[in-house]
Amino acid sequence: MDHAVVRSWSREFSDAAIPLTSSQLMRQHLEGVRLALPFDAAQVLVFDRSKDVHRQIVQVGYPAEVARALAEDFTQNWPSPVWYPVDADDDLPTSISGERDVDGSFRRSHIYRDYLAPAGFLDGITLELKHRGRYVGLANFSSRTLGFYDRSRRLVSAAFATLLAQAISDNARELEAIPPTAHAARVIR
């Protein structure tokens, strides 16, 4: 066997053994999601229970100020502003272009008006990520095309909410910045 081939295999397997950070792993997950749920920009936020805040773990395609507004301002009063679907019986994630344009709707919020729309994002969805019933974070997806997140894409997005929540849960200690020496305790009063 050629010595160069063995060395090449060795490098390939040794590189694969180097663990990815949670951010790198989530970036890979987002790129995988993009194949079935296209987006111009996306962001995954983890809910840090120890500080009662959302923290961005990865974002792709958003200008820095838009990503900051989504991570900090948008999550401050989550789940407000409430999104108002056109069809009240539709339990899929609501898209920006698929919601009613009424007072209090997301399209009239300062997040959309001051950040997303000026950056050219005309449609988007937010997925609430839950693992085993526990809220673990949010995933934001945006498109520059009005009406992009139609019913079929929203249906696909619902499946990815579960997978992204699982990925967050698998890395919870690192993502929530919980010290490895921390232990849970149950207090009964």
Model-predicted regions and their roles:
Residues 4-20, 24-148, 152, 156, ...:
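Regulatory input/activation interfaces that engage signals or partners
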Residues 170-189:
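Signal-transducing coiled-coil/dimerization helices and immediately adjacent hinge/linker segments
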